[in-house]
């Protein structure tokens, strides 16, 4: 029974979230009122199941809950504000209508997800290559445990830099706003499952989707070990750009080791100290260029 749960929870979690969001968006419910309770319900579910069957027992409890929840709320508000800004721009700027709106709604959402996902991957990858971007992105890597809230732990400026390109492109090509909102909600739930402390197994799905088994390698404390698996939803980008990595033998025998930032053992632990940290400190893992 445990093994069945481990292999089925990811597809059940994501498919049910996907179709719940699609159904609510098509039902005429306010797009923001539709996604907030869905994200909250799946967040609560992720919290409960990862505490019931943890991958790493040392990650079950921590002192970072309030900090990470603050990041989640702040960054969600940034997303909503950005979308309202883009809606306002769309009213005043006659963007071309190139997006295939004749497709079924669920296919439109998958297409928008793919567009947004590529730019998330690309900016994330560059954030490990250039020092000025890394200083912002280091906030995400400062956690010393992985659990469902880590997915949205980003510096506010990095949140804007990482999310804007894909969303702006969607706007420019005429993607309907409900499609973008649905795509972002589904992505948020996948990020929960990507960072969760739940001991689940994705099986063949990890060849296609960015699951926890892959993303945990990305959070290893040693800089040289963490330059892998940048994707947020699809693994295809990591495979194309040769940044994909997996080692099941070591994963299941030795684990992934410590996570965090080895070069920064005294990283600030409050929101505002972390907010200002990139602007006045020389953060570890400097640019290689």
Question: Where are these predicted regions, by residue range?
Answer:
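Aromatic-anchored segments of alpha-helical transmembrane domains
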Residues: 16-21, 189-193
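Hydrophobic alpha-helical transmembrane segments of polytopic
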Residues: 35, 39-42, 113, 183
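N-terminal membrane topogenic signal
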Residues: 1-12
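Short, hydrophobic transmembrane alpha-helix segments
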Residues: 20-33
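Cytosolic-facing loops and C-terminal tails of multi-pass membrane proteins
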Residues: 239, 250-289
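Membrane-embedded catalytic scaffold of the fatty acid hydroxylase/desaturase
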Residues: 70-257
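Membrane-helix interface linkers and caps
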Residues: 42-70, 90-100
